[in-house]
């Protein structure tokens, strides 16, 4: 399975599931037209790291979501924002064939070489106390500090590895209080 470098922005969970059947990738769902401030923060962070690919349905709603993302990111330099487009009009990502999705994404995607992507494992999260009972406060502290958005352990691990956050950085946040976020990140609001 090929590994995609950029975060892919899709409309919903079914779109995300479909992409993960085809590629190893990090996906963010907008949940439709009402994109949360938290999602925008994660996307801004992704722009500064590996970039994003907007891959919405090829219908009017998909176009509106694409425009809203661009407007809310207030990002004039489009170099780190790529657009994957389905060739058929009024086609949903989740209902598209494997070939259609691969064709759309391969035009704009950067791929990792196998083995080039390293990072933390679920065992690391367990050792850091970010999973299991009594872990919620610690996990939320890490998610908020690094602007990773909310989510389950799998999503947390995926985003930690996507943003190449080191175990030592996480340990520092867990053990310190009121530390400012890394350079280039806004303090949590």
Name these PLM-found stretches.
Residues 29:
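Conserved PDZ fold ligand-binding element
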Residues 2, 21-25, 33, 37-179, ...:
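TOPRIM fold recognition
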